[in-house]
């Protein structure tokens, strides 16, 4: 018995068209140019994108209809947003260069190795640093930081910093007022 994909022919066709549209109409623009155009393309394919969200041209989005980005959310250069299930990026949250958001996996105890999917949530003011991996079903809570190259396979508590493989607690995140006020 061969591998059976969980995706319908309609889904595969929709993803093919999306990939061609993004490659031809968004990728040619350098870095931060044409943000409105890129948001419009994502919205045309069902993404829920705030007018201030930032998506770089080199970002890969598997299924835009399963992506939600709030105000000032950012998917930076080279981010791989493999959203077989939904991904929600909160207000002022940043996913930095070449990070990998992976909502899919396989059931290793299933002899047929069927695909499993679970949503990812990156809450307000969280930061997923460069080349970090966020696994299926993970919530990165408000204000949390996932250090560069962290492998995050469990939820991250609010206002904490995690890092390593697998990611472990490093310290609490404390904001200071750089303007000198109270």
Language-model region placement:
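Flexible, glycine/small-residue-enriched loop-and-beta-strand segment within the central core
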Residues: 28-39, 57-70, 74-139, 165-166, ...
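Beta-rich strand-turn-strand
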Residues: 130-154
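Short, Lys/Arg-enriched, disordered terminal segments
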Residues: 1-3, 180-182
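Acidic, glycine-centered active-site loop in nucleotide-sugar glycosyltransferases
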Residues: 158, 163-166
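Short conserved AdoMet
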Residues: 50, 139, 157
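A transmembrane-helix-recognition feature enriched in membrane-embedded lipid enzymes
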Residues: 2-52
């Amino acid at each position: 018995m061969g591998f059976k994909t969980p995706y319908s022919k309609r889904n595969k066709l929709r993803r093919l068209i999306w990939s061609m549209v993004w490659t031809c109409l968004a990728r040619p623009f350098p870095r931060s140019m044409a943000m409105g155009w890129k948001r419009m393309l994502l919205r045309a394919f069902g993404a829920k994108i705030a007018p201030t969200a930032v998506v770089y041209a080199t970002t890969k989005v598997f299924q835009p209809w399963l992506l939600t980005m709030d105000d000032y959310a950012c998917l930076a250069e080279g981010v791989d947003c493999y959203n077989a299930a939904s991904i929600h990026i909160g207000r002022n949250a940043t996913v930095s260069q070449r990070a990998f958001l992976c909502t899919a996996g396989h059931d290793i105890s299933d002899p047929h190795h069927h695909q499993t999917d679970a949503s990812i949530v990156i809450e307000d003011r969280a930061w997923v640093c460069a080349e970090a991996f966020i696994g299926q079903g993970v919530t990165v809570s408000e204000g949390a930081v996932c250090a560069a190259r962290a492998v995050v396979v469990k939820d991250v508590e609010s206002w904490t910093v995690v890092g390593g493989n697998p990611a472990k607690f490093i310290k609490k995140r404390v904001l200071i007022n750089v303007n000198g006020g109270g």
